[in-house]
């Protein structure tokens, strides 16, 4: 037996040390990599037909953000279906999910791999994977020894999952124990301290019945926060209804919110329920709530206060039971002071405010997010491998990301498409040249991109119009074609922006 009692005892000790579960898992992985003398090790959690890395050693940092779906990774599927130790021969035809993800060996294939499924009774809860560039590295370890390691890790992971479930129930006692199954791509990615704090606050407020105001810049992921709150609440089995207030023309906004009866106005050919009725006993997400008119804010306040609403054209009162989650990228408190937003409505909504940090304040999460989007992009484009070079990741971490996570996602996809056209291969590595971003301030990039390649013989007036049109177009895309948000970002009056757009033949 190659593994000594002392070695196994040291593993058990590592599982009891550390201040947090994350720290314990990292210590475990570090110890196992040293013990087995391999090049890479990983502890994965199994949920929703995919593996999620909890701790890694010897792998690129962006692996922590990747989600390995079974149907896209045959090696991991083989581990999930196995009842014990899985050894992959060095010449295995099954692609290794970590190919190209061992730093310093970007172009070198992983040679030897073993996988240990982790079970709690009969349920698969995770896996351990070990990889080595030496094809013979794992031959000296018996299956019995590896099963002992598996048993220790499975017990630790199962205990962690039980503690997590108990903590979640303690923080949200009104939430249903099982909760609802998250939709694909609903996960909030991030291990930075600000994101850990945000996740903690979400867990606290989710099981309550409080209305929540979620603030943050465009593209930070406010809708993901909304979904996390809804899924962690007692209303999770009931509807989550979405309404973008900024996209509502004033003439139809009241009908969209409260519904209407047949004949209430021209075109009302039948009765129609509004968003409040659709969300009865569930949750209503009011995105960009700061764009509602003051008159509609007054009617919204009444429904929030008393649960009473009237369809347009109807004298009858309906009662609804709806939880409000509102989001905005505006400073509503200042808007209330300025008279642009009702102060009483602001206080009703902001009982438990949540602020989602911009990406520039969580730089340590960029690698995880980049890995997450690389894996999704790899699957969508049908690639065998999609990795980031060290230089590319460094460039991503130095950029200010004014469009936040949404801009990062679009940049990854655009870079992958450029790389595929250039390399004509199913195994791609993204380089700095594949990204159109530049480290530092945004204005320089905008100026470079907005002006034509040659300005010789072009009048200053024409150049000015070209520049204005380009900047407005780029900002519109960043703001998801939201003119009101675009005006705020460009620090323009909304009416002036619309007039300028018409003058530039953009409307």
Swiss-Prot record:
Q: Which residues bind DNA?
A: 483-502
Q: What is this protein called?
A: Anaerobic nitric oxide reductase transcription regulator NorR
Q: Name one Pfam family in it.
A: GAF
Entry-linked CDD domains: AAA
Gene3D superfamilies linked: 1.10.8.60, 3.30.450.40, Homeodomain-like (1.10.10.60), P-loop containing nucleotide triphosphate hydrolases (3.40.50.300)
Biological function: Required for the expression of anaerobic nitric oxide (NO) reductase, acts as a transcriptional activator for at least the norVW operon. Activation also requires sigma-54.
Q: Which SMART domains match?
A: AAA (SM00382), GAF (SM00065)
Q: Which GO terms describe its molecular function?
A: ATP binding; ATP hydrolysis activity; DNA binding; DNA-binding transcription factor activity
Q: Where along the chain is ATP bound?
A: 216-223, 279-288
Q: Which UniProt keywords apply?
A: ATP-binding, DNA-binding, Nucleotide-binding, Phosphoprotein, Transcription, Transcription regulation
User: Sigma-54 factor interaction domain spans which residues?
Assistant: 188-417
Q: Which domain of life is it from?
A: Bacteria
Matching entries from InterPro entries are given as: AAA+_ATPase (IPR003593), GAF (IPR003018), GAF-like_dom_sf (IPR029016), Homeodomain-like_sf (IPR009057), NorR (IPR023944), P-loop_NTPase (IPR027417), Sigma_54_int (IPR002078), Sigma_54_int_dom_ATP-bd_1 (IPR025662)
């Amino acid at each position: 037996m190659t593994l000594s009692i002392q070695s196994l005892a040291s593993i058990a000790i590592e599982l009891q040390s550390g201040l947090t579960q994350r720290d314990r898992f990292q210590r475990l992985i570090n110890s196992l990599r040293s013990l087995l003398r391999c090049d890479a090790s990983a502890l994965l959690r199994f949920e929703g037909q995919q593996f999620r890395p909890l701790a890694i050693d010897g792998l690129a940092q962006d692996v922590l953000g990747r989600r390995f779906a079974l149907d896209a990774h045959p090696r991991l599927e083989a581990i999930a279906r196995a009842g014990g130790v899985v050894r992959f021969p060095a010449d295995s035809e099954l692609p290794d999910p970590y190919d190209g993800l061992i730093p310093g060996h970007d172009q070198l294939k992983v040679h030897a791999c073993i996988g240990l499924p982790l079970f709690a009774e009969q349920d698969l809860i995770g896996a351990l994977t070990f990889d080595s560039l030496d094809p013979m590295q794992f031959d000296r370890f018996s299956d019995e020894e590896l099963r002992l390691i598996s048993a220790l890790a499975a017990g630790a992971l199962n205990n962690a999952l039980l503690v997590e479930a108990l903590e979640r129930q303690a923080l949200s006692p009104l939430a249903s124990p099982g909760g609802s199954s998250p939709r694909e791509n609903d996960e909030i990615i991030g291990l930075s301290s600000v994101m850990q704090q945000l996740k903690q606050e979400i867990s606290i407020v989710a099981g309550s019945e409080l209305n929540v105001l979620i603030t943050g810049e465009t593209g930070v992921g406010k809708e993901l926060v909304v979904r996390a709150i809804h899924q962690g609440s007692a209303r999770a089995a009931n509807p989550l209804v979405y309404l973008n207030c900024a996209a509502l023309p004033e003439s139809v906004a009241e009908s969209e919110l409260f519904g209407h009866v047949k004949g209430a106005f021209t075109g009302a050919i039948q009765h129609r329920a509004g968003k409040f009725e659709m969300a009865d006993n569930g949750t209503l997400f009011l995105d960009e709530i700061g764009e509602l008119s003051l008159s509609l804010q007054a009617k919204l306040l009444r429904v929030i206060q008393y649960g009473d609403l009237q369809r347009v054209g109807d004298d009858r009162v309906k009662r609804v039971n709806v939880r409000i989650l509102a989001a905005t990228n505006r400073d509503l408190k200042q808007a209330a002071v300025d008279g642009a937003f009702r102060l009483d409505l602001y206080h009703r909504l902001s009982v438990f405010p949540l602020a989602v940090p911009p990406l520039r304040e969580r730089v340590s999460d960029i690698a995880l997010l980049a890995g997450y989007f690389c894996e999704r992009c790899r699957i969508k484009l049908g690639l065998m491998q999609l990795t980031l070079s060290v230089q590319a990741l460094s460039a991503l971490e130095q950029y200010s990301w004014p469009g936040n996570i949404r801009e990062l996602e679009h940049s990854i996809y655009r870079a992958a498409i450029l790389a595929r056209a250039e390399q004509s291969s199913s195994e791609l590595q993204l380089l700095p040249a594949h990204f159109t971003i530049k480290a530092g301030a945004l204005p320089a990039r905008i100026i470079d991109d907005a002006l034509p390649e040659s300005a010789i013989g072009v009048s200053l007036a024409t150049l000015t119009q070209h520049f204005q049109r380009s900047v407005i177009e780029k900002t519109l895309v960043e703001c998801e074609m939201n003119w009101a948000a675009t005006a705020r970002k460009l620090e323009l009056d909304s009416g002036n922006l619309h007039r300028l757009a018409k003058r530039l033949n953009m409307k």
